[in-house]
Amino acid sequence: MIKPKIALTIAGTDPTGGAGVMADLKSFHSCGVYGMGVVTSIVAQNTLGVQHIHNLNHQWVDEQLDSVFNDTLPHAIKTGMIATADTMETIRHYLMQHESIPYVIDPVMLAKSGDSLMDNNTKQNLQHTLLPLADVVTPNLPEAEEITGLTIDSEEKIMQAGRIFINEIGSKGVIIKGGHSNDADIAKDYLFTKEGVQTFENERFKTKHTHGTGCTFSAVITAELAKGRPLFEAVHKAKKFISMSIQYTPEIGRGRGPVNHFAYLKKEGLDDELSK
């Protein structure tokens, strides 16, 4: 029997399954990798917004990470919601011990509803602790603005932001997602590495049901990196995956509903291919 590749997510929860650890694990499964999850925050949220956040003590996060790393090693790691500086330092300790494992950061700062998920001190700490360790960071436009301090209102500003991530912050790669731009028809993303810039375009679907798209997108990249895919291929797969998951959204809940984490699998019938 061939052992599956393992992807680890370190993030907050969503009891409705649209975002956070729950969305990551479903995305990992759809990509044919074995998912593991460490919880940083218990978040009471649904499609209508975030009601309550209970951040776990960093020692509890450490205990979970210790349980994982004392038993097995993941082939790729992603972090999502990290609400305190102490928890960032805890995660950094494990990443520094395993620098060869691909690491993806989804810098979760705002929920789709607009609710803030990270205080200003923690946002500043992110730049010095985790971003320099990342193989790829996946900010949307508002998150890229928060991190770089720029007002990103043009393609030129996107290019400037990408250079800040690579040349000043020290991330190996960053994909700045253009889904929050005002373009009515096309969603354009920009992948920056030391080698240059590559762009990805896809149709923008007219739906409000996009809860958890950032989590899902970064989770698919993580799964593909766990399988040994090059970064460009991982991002290309994630773009196809997220487009289909939005196109076939299940329309759950009374607000901004989740995407369909199994649409790619079911539509294409790629169960075997995805597990390769």
From Swiss-Prot:
It is an enzyme of class 2 (transferase). Keywords: ATP-binding, Kinase, Nucleotide-binding, Thiamine biosynthesis, Transferase. One of its GO terms (biological process) is thiamine diphosphate biosynthetic process. It catalyses: 4-amino-5-hydroxymethyl-2-methylpyrimidine + ATP = 4-amino-2-methyl-5-(phosphooxymethyl)pyrimidine + ADP + H(+); 4-amino-2-methyl-5-(phosphooxymethyl)pyrimidine + ATP = 4-amino-2-methyl-5-(diphosphooxymethyl)pyrimidine + ADP. InterPro entries: HMP/HMP-P_kinase_dom (IPR004399), PM/HMP-P_kinase-1 (IPR013749), Ribokinase-like (IPR029056). 4-amino-5-hydroxymethyl-2-methylpyrimidine binds at Q45. Its EC number is 2.7.1.49, 2.7.4.7. Pathway: Cofactor biosynthesis; thiamine diphosphate biosynthesis; 4-amino-2-methyl-5-diphosphomethylpyrimidine from 5-amino-1-(5-phospho-D-ribosyl)imidazole: step 2/3; Cofactor biosynthesis; thiamine diphosphate biosynthesis; 4-amino-2-methyl-5-diphosphomethylpyrimidine from 5-amino-1-(5-phospho-D-ribosyl)imidazole: step 3/3. Disulfide bonds: none annotated. GO terms for cellular component: cytosol. GO terms for molecular function: ATP binding; hydroxymethylpyrimidine kinase activity; phosphomethylpyrimidine kinase activity. Catalyzes the phosphorylation of hydroxymethylpyrimidine phosphate (HMP-P) to HMP-PP, and of HMP to HMP-P. NCBIfam families: HMP-P_kinase (TIGR00097). Belongs to the ThiD family. This is Hydroxymethylpyrimidine/phosphomethylpyrimidine kinase. It comes from Staphylococcus aureus (strain MRSA252). The gene is thiD.
